[in-house]
Amino acid sequence: MWSMGLIRRTAMSNAIRASSQRTWLGHGGLRSCVTVKTPSEDEEEKKKEITIAEAKKLMRLVNVEDMKKKLVGVADRDVVSYSTLLEASQGMGIARSPDEAHVFARVLDDAGVVLIFRDKVYLHPDKVVDLIRRAMPLDQNPEEDQIKEEFNKLRIMKEEIDVLAHRQVRKILWCGLATSMVQIGLFFRLTFWEFSWDVMEPITFFATATGIIVGYAYFLMTSRDPTYQDFMKRLFLSRQRKLLKSHKFDCERFKELERLFKMTSSCHAAASIRNRVGLELDLEDALQSRRD
C-alpha cells in the first residue's frame, strides 16, 4: 500500500509539471483550480511593449528624412520642441503611445539623427558640432581645415545656385500662366465681340489639339508622363545645369567632399526647395543631365 501511494504521488507530481495551464489538487473529494501563468502569456505581454531593439528596427524602416522635413516645415527652423517630435512620431504612425514615442526619440538621439538637449530637439546635429568647434577649437590637422573650408565654400555656392535656379523657374512658370490667361482673354474677345462662335470654334479646337500633340511629343522625347510636376523638375535641372556650368562649379569634387564629411543634401537649399514645391532633387540628377 505504501508503494502504491508513492507511485500515485509521483504520477500526480508529474502531471502537475506537465500541465501548462491548471493544477488540480484532490483533497477530501473536493477539487480546487489554480491558474498558472504560462511562458507564452508572458511572451505575449512582452510583445505588446516596444523595446529598444524594435525601435531601432523601426528607425531603419522609417524614412527619417521625411520626418525631419515635416518638422522643419512645421517649425521653419532647425530647432523644435521635444513635444513636437513626440507628436510627429505619433502622427506618422511610428509610435502607438507616448511611451513608444519617448523610446523612439531616445533611439534617434543615440543614433545621432537628432540632438536632444534641455527639452529641445536639434534637427541638424552637425551644425551644433560646427558651432562647438568654433567656440572650442580642437587640435586639427591643417590639411583637414583646408578641406573643410573648401567644402563650405562649395556648399554655399551650391545653395546660391539652387536658389537662383528656383527663382528663374518660378519666373518662367508665372510667365506661362500669364500667357495662358492672355490667350483665353483673346479668344473670349474674338468670340463675343469681333467674330462669332462659328468662326472661333475651329480655331479653339486646333489650339486644344496642338496642346495635346505637344504633350504627346514630350512623352515621346522624355519617356515620362507630361505632368506639371515633371515639367517643373526638368526645367529646374536645366536651369541648374546651366548655372553650374556658368559658375564653373566642380560637382565631382563636391560629391567627394560630401561623402568625406558624411553630410547629406538635406542641409542645403535643395531641402527648402523640396519643402516648398515638393520636388525630389539631388545633385546626381544634375550630373546625369550634364552627361546626357
UniProtKB/Swiss-Prot annotation:
InterPro entries: MCU_C, MCU_fam. The chain crosses the membrane at residues 172-192, 202-222. The keyword Phosphoprotein does not apply. A motif (Selectivity filter) lies at residues 197-205. Ca(2+) binds at residue 201. Mainly expressed in roots. Residues 1-18 form a transit peptide. Its main location: mitochondrion. PANTHER family: CALCIUM UNIPORTER PROTEIN 6, MITOCHONDRIAL (PTHR13462:SF41), CALCIUM UNIPORTER PROTEIN, MITOCHONDRIAL (PTHR13462). Mitochondrial inner membrane calcium uniporter that mediates calcium uptake into mitochondria. Constitutes a pore-forming and calcium-conducting subunit. Mitochondrial calcium homeostasis plays key roles in cellular physiology and regulates cell bioenergetics, cytoplasmic calcium signals and activation of cell death pathways. This is Calcium uniporter protein 1, mitochondrial. The gene is MCU1.
